[in-house]
Amino acid sequence: MNRIALAVAVTLALVGCSRSPEPADPASPAAAPAARTAPVALPAAPSDTATATPSFDCAKATSDAEKWVCTDEGLAALDRQLAARYKRAQTAPDEVDIAAEQRGWIKGRDACTRAVDPRQCLREAYQTRLVELTVSSGGVPASATGTYRCDDADKPLKVVFYNDIDPAAAIVTLGTDQAIVFPIESASGSRYGREGVAFWEHQGEATLDFYGTALRCTADR
């Protein structure tokens, strides 16, 4: 299986990168489709007492990240969802690769406790891994694919939208760099983002802020 790196950024620490296959281009038009909006931001402060039920035993939580998950039902729900999806992925022919990726992802998730907003970082880490496992499983059709001409002609922009998976997402490829982004409520056009990345498209015009690189782009016709 052809697998490519997907960037996962945090504010103060780099979350461990995972790998997933190059998504196939659907026959859909390039314009970004309507999508479900991203979840509301999680509460900012943790509790000292386990109040949620993730896939693991909170009494045996060893990392600070696991302890954060144990105090927030939203994160715990994502953890349960990821545990179920990872279990299904373990039946794949490249199970060894997936196990190694998961260990790397756990290290990245644990680094989220050093981020400015640990809960946002944890939420994005879980959502990103869910998308990676879903897309890498194969047979997941994209909602649409957009290709764009940007200010930096040396770095073509491609955005593949997956709005019928949970969580809904898009994979942004700028040159050889990639990031998974999530729908954000927008008054007009389609907006996706994550910490460090913001993509907005409306009627063939797009803007992208990719970890400090700001571009204006036009959709290919």
Label each region the model flagged:
Residues 17-20:
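Bacterial signal peptide processing site
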Residues 122-139:
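Short, structured interface segments
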Residues 57, 65-96:
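Amphipathic, heptad-repeat alpha-helical segments
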Residues 1-15:
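Sec-dependent bacterial lipoprotein signal peptides
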Residues 141-156, 192:
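Tryptophan-anchored aromatic micro-motifs
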Residues 122, 198-216:
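Short, exposed beta-strand-loop hairpins at the edges of beta-sheets
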Residues 168-193:
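Central antiparallel beta-sheet cores of small beta-barrel/beta-sandwich binding domains
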Residues 25-53:
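Post-signal peptide N-terminal segment of mature Sec-exported envelope proteins
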